[in-house]
Amino acid sequence: MAFTLYALIQTAILFTNAIAVLHEERFLSKIGWGAEQGVGGFGDDPGIKAQLLNLIRSVRTVMRVPLIAVNSVCIVLLLLFG
């Protein structure tokens, strides 16, 4: 497989899909990354764990509908052009 722009875009889509399907109660809480784990005090700098949890929640919230459209376009392109 050649290293193309389409391959990079497809990699980003797959990575975003992987983040979007992570379920907080079924998966993240089992490894200690549940909702109550990343709470910090006011004025405290959030740690890397809290920032990653916020990123995961944001991706799941904001990218749910656009991912459906992007995945559909990607599937159609793969069907048409192989």
UniProtKB/Swiss-Prot annotation:
Q: Which domain of life is it from?
A: Eukaryota
Q: What is its main location?
A: endoplasmic reticulum
Q: Which UniProt keywords apply?
A: Endoplasmic reticulum, Membrane, Protein transport, Transmembrane, Transmembrane helix, Transport
GO cellular component: a single term: Golgi membrane
User: Among its keywords, does the record have Cell wall biogenesis/degradation?
Assistant: no
In this record, what's one Pfam family? Yos1
The membrane-topology field of this record reads: Multi-pass membrane protein
Q: Tell me, what does this protein do in biology?
A: Regulator of endoplasmic reticulum secretion that acts as a key determinant of brain size. Required for secretion of extracellular matrix proteins. Required for correct brain development by depositing sufficient extracellular matrix proteins for tissue integrity and the proliferation of neural progenitors. Acts as a regulator of the unfolded protein response (UPR).
Protein's recorded name: Immediate early response 3-interacting protein 1
